[in-house]
Amino acid sequence: MPPSGLRLLPLLLPLLWLLVLTPGRPAAGLSTCKTIDMELVKRKRIEAIRGQILSKLRLASPPSQGEVPPGPLPEAVLALYNSTRAQVAGESAETEPEPEADYYAKEVTRVLMVEKENEIYKTVETGSHSIYMFFNTSELRAAVPDPMLLSRAELRLLRLKLSVEQHVELYQKYSNNSWRYLSNRLLTPSDSPEWLSFDVTGVVRQWLSQGGAMEGFRLSAHCSCDSKDNTLRVGINGFSSSRRGDLATIDGMNRPFLLLMATPLERAQQLHSSRHRRALDTNYCFSSTEKNCCVRQLYIDFRKDLGWKWIHEPKGYHANFCLGPCPYIWSLDTQYSKVLALYNQHNPGASAAPCCVPQVLEPLPIVYYVGRKPKVEQLSNMIVRSCKCS
């Protein structure tokens, strides 16, 4: 007698033949998804977190809650907890590079400082304390039409040989003729010229977004309270008027400039579309009608949901979880996926499709008591920030 699988084969062959003749269409036509009980999913997630916390703390069971002392935490413990929280917040706030923008080659453009003969230089006070560098923003916009395409901007200065050490400061010009401090540099003596570079990406991106015609920087000697001499002793190429002829031309070409690195304009629409899709995913993740793999909000109150009083800080946190289908491509050249769908119909416990899983996880700092002793711990991978199909 043939095995049961072979007995079913004659019944499946007509259906498989029909699938082969069917044009590619969405997987929803043969969806076997059942209605999801969100409350059940949340309860399972809460119980998983209960075990996760105990496991990470190497505790077989929750500590005794009768010995937790009343009142506020000791000052040293609270300071340690707050500093740990600040560190985690700082790390999570760091902007992650976008894969699309990082992939494409960057166009590099050099925009020279406006020549000293321009009328704009008459609007600032001249003296031995500072030098001024102005840039035509129309040239910047011609190089980078969209501020979001700018990857990096550097102010490059060719300093001449320097016989004494000097501390210099860089400032940005504001519209009301005030100056905003940006950065500083300690310059050491040198017998040869040397290029100086300042990261001014944020400033240039701001200029590209505004409508000003001329924007500028100021390089000044550091004003020391211990010294009355605030002369800018470092020489910057392009500010010397003693050169003539070819040497003056070379000086002019090496005068201060902005080095711009930006994604090519032809990629702008593609990057905008991908950002728009990511923004929609972020918004829709918390909608009850969302059907894709995404982050679902879940706040866990330690006392209410877990019945724990031994975790003193925080009182709860957004653990979140990933949920949603991960459809795979159905087309004439991937008909095997339809066979897998039939397989799943007859084997509901198995899964050959990709799953919705966490992509970015963040740690959770806590203060808890073991007996009457408070401890600060950082639990890794406790907060789901984004999901992916894998």
UniProtKB/Swiss-Prot annotation:
One cellular component (GO) term of this entry: nucleus
SMART domains with a match to the protein in the record: TGFB
GO-annotated molecular function: cytokine activity; growth factor activity; type I transforming growth factor beta receptor binding; type II transforming growth factor beta receptor binding; type III transforming growth factor beta receptor binding
Keyword Disulfide bond part of the UniProt annotation: yes
Keyword Glycoprotein on entry: yes
GO biological process, alphabetically ordered: ATP biosynthetic process; cell-cell junction organization; cellular response to transforming growth factor beta stimulus; chondrocyte differentiation; epithelial to mesenchymal transition; extracellular matrix assembly; extrinsic apoptotic signaling pathway; hematopoietic progenitor cell differentiation
Signal peptide bounds: 1-29
Record keywords, A-Z: Cleavage on pair of basic residues, Disulfide bond, Extracellular matrix, Glycoprotein, Growth factor, Mitogen, Secreted, Signal
Motif (Cell attachment site): 244-246
Cleavage, annotated site positions: R278, A279
Domain of life, per lineage: Eukaryota
Modification note: Transforming growth factor beta-1 proprotein: The precursor proprotein is cleaved in the Golgi apparatus by FURIN to form Transforming growth factor beta-1 (TGF-beta-1) and Latency-associated peptide (LAP) chains, which remain non-covalently linked, rendering TGF-beta-1 inactive.
Positions of region (Bowtie tail): 226-252
Arm domain: annotated segments: 75-271
Entry-listed glycosylation sites: N82, N136, N176
CDD domains: TGF_beta_TGFB1
Subunit structure: Homodimer; disulfide-linked. Interacts with the serine proteases, HTRA1 and HTRA3: the interaction with either inhibits TGFB1-mediated signaling and the HTRA protease activity is required for this inhibition. May interact with THSD4; this interaction may lead to sequestration by FBN1 microfibril assembly and attenuation of TGFB signaling. Interacts with CD109, DPT and ASPN. Interacts with EFEMP2. Interacts with TSKU; the interaction contributes to regulation of the hair cycle. Interacts with TGFBR3.
Family named by the database record: Belongs to the TGF-beta family.
Listed name of the protein: Transforming growth factor beta-1 proprotein
Gene name linked to the record: TGFB1
